[in-house]
Curated annotation (Swiss-Prot):
Domain Pyruvate carboxyltransferase: 5-268
Assembly information from the UniProt record: Homodimer.
Name this polypeptide is given: 2-isopropylmalate synthase
GO MF terms, alphabetically ordered: 2-isopropylmalate synthase activity; acetyl-CoA C-acetyltransferase activity; manganese ion binding
Stored HAMAP family: LeuA_type1
Keyword Amino-acid biosynthesis attributed: yes
Length: 514
């Protein structure tokens, strides 16, 4: 049995299924590049059959990412598998991940298939996938609620057909650690050809036990792959958190006895990128990547850490990518210094045009804000990269406001609609409401505001505000993110970013889930 734990990241597929976390192709590419830099073993880049947009994203990522295996999800049918294979053609290393539900509830109520029909479809799906690659993963959806004898029968058959990874899906987060770990162990013991495949765990966090269940699957069950997402992103209560799995196994190597090949210094930068793109703010007390993960407020704890860090710290903050909040650049800094700092942060822009545009935004910010931090630079580049790579139907031009005591604030917003400037004016219950009303008066999107949140990128009164806006229309939910030292301007940018995503025609199907 290998002593390495394979990390399978599904942020771009299962993570994206979280309401409001839908990503553009360009955003997926940026995250995929960060995952490759982190040395993630397998990147599930999407579900090729779900939409042309997802197919295109997988195909592009497969051509750009060379050091990680690129995977596409596919239902257990020839059409889905063919689509996945086509999307993965440019990949140096490709994997097809096919699945079908095996629990009595899912077979009867959702699939309306008999166990024998499911058995045959699973077997034939793996056989067909093997025509395109020798790296095939099979997942029994809702595996943790499946009949054990039937599950053994299905898994033995798909391994015989050539499945090289068997992924035990706790699709609804029903498992508890001891039972789930023993399920994986029992499957490996009872299936005669289990030694021909690597067993994997895929857990959801509905009862708050996704990480615990995954670790039990590894320690008790002998699984050697964990499927997880950055920040635990995922539908409902989320998925197994990559950062927690990786650091648990590394920190407690004495217990797990496994190696993880990731560059853990990339964890926090990647966490921040995913949070910025999706608009899902990381809770301050989140393990490993939360702002308070390495903070000590108790006087006793502070005294201990000052004397010896290991009194209260079991990990080093710098080992997961936390850096001191240092002032790095100012208004006198030149283009070369800006470019060098981007390289030090591991940030790349695709063209000189993007670099020049980002530098101009940096100079504009430096004129308004005396101290520029790494977080400011990352926010600038993230927003500029999104502007450069996405087609903007709506573009923010300018904003002015007027507010007098006892009267509703008034906002005047200038927008460019496909290059033509229009001006909207409106009042509202506060400056942000007035601004949104002014935008809607010109755009008329008919969308519903589901979420409005503000986060300070750095500390101090000069800090940039990062605003997340979540809009819903006709069943589609999108996030928009905007940054600016002026919170109302940041709000306008975020609202417009969300409108641009709504305007996109790349609607997705609602796939079966594992």
């Amino acid at each position: 049995m290998t002593d390495k734990l394979i990390i399978f990241d599904t942020t771009l597929r299962d993570g994206e299924q979280s309401p409001g976390a839908s990503m553009t192709k360009e955003e997926k590419i940026r995250i995929a590049k960060h995952l490759e830099r982190m040395k993630v073993d397998v990147i599930e880049a999407g579900f090729a059959a779900s939409s042309n947009g997802d197919f295109d994203a997988i195909h592009t990522i497969a051509g750009l990412v060379k050091d990680s295996t690129i995977c596409s999800l596919a239902r257990a049918n020839d059409k889905d598998i063919q689509r996945a294979a086509d999307a993965l053609k440019p990949a140096n290393s490709a994997r097809i991940h096919t699945f079908i539900a095996t629990s009595p509830l899912h077979m009867e109520k959702k699939l309306r298939m008999t166990p024998d029909q499911v058995f045959e479809q699973a077997r034939l799906a793996v056989r067909f996938a093997r025509k395109f690659t020798d790296n095939v993963e099979f997942s029994p959806e809702d595996g943790s609620r499946s009949d054990l004898d039937f599950l053994c029968r299905v898994l033995e058959a798909v391994i015989a057909e050539g499945a090289t990874t068997i992924n035990i899906a706790d699709t609804v987060g029903y498992g508890v650690p001891e039972l789930y770990g023993n399920l994986v162990k029992t499957l490996r013991e009872r299936i005669p050809n289990s030694d021909k495949a690597i067993f994997s765990v895929h857990c959801h966090n509905d009862l708050g036990m996704a990480v615990a269940n995954s670790l039990a699957g590894v320690k008790i069950g002998g699984a050697r792959q964990v499927e997880c997402t950055i920040n635990g992103l995922g539908e409902r209560a989320g998925n197994t958190s990559l950062e927690e799995i990786v650091m648990a196994v590394k920190t407690r190597k004495d217990y797990f006895g496994l190696d993880v090949g990731l560059d853990t210094t990339q964890i926090v930068p990647t966490s921040k990128l995913v949070s910025q793109i999706t608009g899902f703010v990381v809770q301050p007390n989140k393990a490993v990547v939360g702002a308070n993960a390495f903070a000590h407020a108790s006087g006793i704890h502070q005294d201990g850490v000052l004397k010896a860090r290991d009194t209260y710290e079991i990990m080093r903050a710098e080992d997961v990518g936390w850096t001191a909040n240092k002032i790095v650049l100012g208004k006198l800094s030149g283009r070369n210094a800006f470019k060098q700092r981007l390289q030090e942060l591991g940030v790349s822009l695709d063209s000189e045009t993007e670099l020049n545009a980002a530098f101009m935004r940096f100079k504009d910010l430096a004129d308004r804000k005396s101290d520029i931090f790494d977080e400011d630079i990352i926010a600038i580049v993230s927003e500029e990269s999104a502007f450069a790579q996405e087609q903007e139907h709506y573009k923010f031009v300018s904003l002015s406001q007027r507010s007098e005591t006892g009267e509703q604030p008034q906002a005047k917003v200038v927008l460019a609609l496909d290059g033509k400037e229009v001006t909207g004016e409106a009042r509202g219950n506060g400056p942000v409401d007035a601004t949104f009303n002014a935008i809607e008066g010109e755009v008329g999107s008919g969308s519903e505001l589901l979420l409005y949140s503000v986060n300070a990128i750095t500390t101090g009164t000069q800090a940039q505000g990062e605003v997340t806006v979540r809009l819903s229309k006709s069943g589609r939910i999108v996030n928009g993110v905007g940054t600016d030292p002026d919170i109302v301007a940041a709000s306008a940018k975020a609202y417009i970013a969300a409108l641009n995503k709504l305007h996109s025609k790349d609607d997705k199907l609602n796939p079966q889930r594992s």
